[in-house]
Swiss-Prot record:
Protein name: tRNA/tmRNA (uracil-C(5))-methyltransferase
Keywords: Methyltransferase, S-adenosyl-L-methionine, Transferase, tRNA processing
Lineage: Bacteria, Pseudomonadati, Pseudomonadota, Gammaproteobacteria, Enterobacterales
Cystine crosslinks: none
A single GO molecular function term of this UniProt record: tRNA (uracil(54)-C5)-methyltransferase activity, S-adenosyl methionine-dependent
Family annotation (Pfam families): tRNA_U5-meth_tr
Leading EC class: transferase
Gene Ontology CC: one annotated term: cytosol
Organism name: Edwardsiella ictaluri (strain 93-146)
Reactions it catalyzes: uridine(54) in tRNA + S-adenosyl-L-methionine = 5-methyluridine(54) in tRNA + S-adenosyl-L-homocysteine + H(+); uridine(341) in tmRNA + S-adenosyl-L-methionine = 5-methyluridine(341) in tmRNA + S-adenosyl-L-homocysteine + H(+)
Length: 366
């Protein structure tokens, strides 16, 4: 596979291999059959990052081969959204003859949405001044004149110049509802929108008929919390990153949801609060013991759940666990499987044509 060419004819084969691999990994835990969720075979990534290579008067996107480390010119990137692919050549055509905008430009990041909005971040190894801002504003206006709903951001060491705003609003159809999600530049968002929709609908189905309240750790911009709010009396969610918390609060209001409470703290801090180890000013006015959380939702980093959080998670009757790294999921399952059993197992093909697997498990207390 090269960045400019996807082996779409082998999509089914690579998905079957992942299903088999996940089944083998989950066999020791008595897991049920894998429920696979397919990705679009192309244009599935809503974000992309490229280094920029300068070659005389020319400049172009590049990526590096993972094995040989050789640079590869990328004029089109079929893994990325059609919106990103439409913009890529037009953006470079505008940058090439512009010395102010191209000088020491080393990277371009794209974040697009199904709703047609896009953020472009230009990264530099130099100080950005008023001349850069004026040139960037002219570029933004020209691209908007060509029909792009674009936000343009400049970044350099300890500098961020935001011409208008650093966010876009995504709209996802989830189980018959149009869910609005504000996505902030340089913050985590699910890269594959089609798979994200399927993950949300799977999580909704897995928790249908659930009793009591939901606790979510690592909630980000509220991606899962807000969709799952319809299945629970109340939702209590934690997130440590300030931009994500602000986006989550906006998303709560935009979706007119009134039963979700976001707390800005880490999973480790929340564990300490629940155990009474520490008191936190951020929890003033929030009675943790008023929540009857029978279900906990976790979508941890690649490293999985730490030991203390793992012990806390075991205290809940139902555990919904989304993992971007089945190896650390299996490590966690050696502990969780002692108190809970896996009743549902899903494979989400978030990253087609790579060895990466995203999966979900529902565990119920034995």
């Amino acid at each position: 596979m090269t960045p400019s060419m996807l082996p779409t004819e082998h999509y089914d084969d690579q998905l079957s291999e992942k299903i088999h691999r996940l089944e083998q990994m989950m066999q020791p835990f008595g897991a049920p059959a894998v429920q696979p969720f397919r990705s679009p075979v192309s244009h599935y990534r809503m974000r992309a990052e490229f280094r920029i290579w300068h070659d005389g008067d020319d400049l172009y996107h590049i990526m590096f081969d993972p094995q040989s480390k050789q640079r590869i010119r990328v004029d089109q990137f079929p893994a990325a959204s059609e919106l990103i692919n439409r913009l890529m050549p037009l953006l470079l055509d505008a940058l090439r003859p512009n010395p102010t905008l191209r000088h020491k430009l080393f990277q371009i990041d794209y974040l697009s949405t199904r709703s047609g909005q896009i953020i472009v971040s230009l990264l530099y190894h130099r100080t950005l001044d008023d001349a850069w801002k004026q040139a960037a504003e002219a570029l933004r206006d020209a691209l908007r004149g060509q029909g792009f709903a674009i936000q343009l951001i400049g970044r350099a060491s300890k500098t961020k110049i935001c011409l208008d705003q650093d966010w876009v609003d995504e709209v996802l159809p989830v189980a018959g509802r149009q869910m609005i999600y504000r996505q902030v530049e340089n913050s985590f968002t699910q890269p594959n929108a089609a798979i994200n929709i399927q993950m949300l609908e799977w999580a909704l189905d897995a928790t249908r008929g659930a009793e009591g309240d939901l606790l979510e750790l690592y909630c980000g911009n509220g991606n899962f919390s807000l969709a799952l709010a319809h299945n629970f009396r109340q939702v209590l969610a934690t997130e440590i990153a300030k931009p994500s918390v602000a986006a989550a609060q906006y998303n709560i209001a935009a979706n007119q949801i009134n039963n979700v409470q976001i707390i800005r703290m880490s999973a480790e801090e929340f564990t300490q609060a629940m155990q009474g180890v520490r008191a936190f000013n951020r929890l003033q006015g929030i009675d943790l013991h008023s929540y009857e959380c029978n279900t906990i939702f976790v979508d941890p980093p690649r490293s999985g759940l730490d030991t203390e959080t793992l012990g806390m998670v075991q205290g809940y009757p139902n555990i919904l666990y989304i993992s971007c790294n089945p190896l650390t999921l299996c490590d966690n399952l050696h502990t969780l499987n002692q108190s809970h059993r896996i009743t549902r197992l899903a494979l989400f093909d978030q990253f087609p044509y790579t060895h990466h697997m995203e999966c979900g498990v529902l565990l119920e207390r034995r």
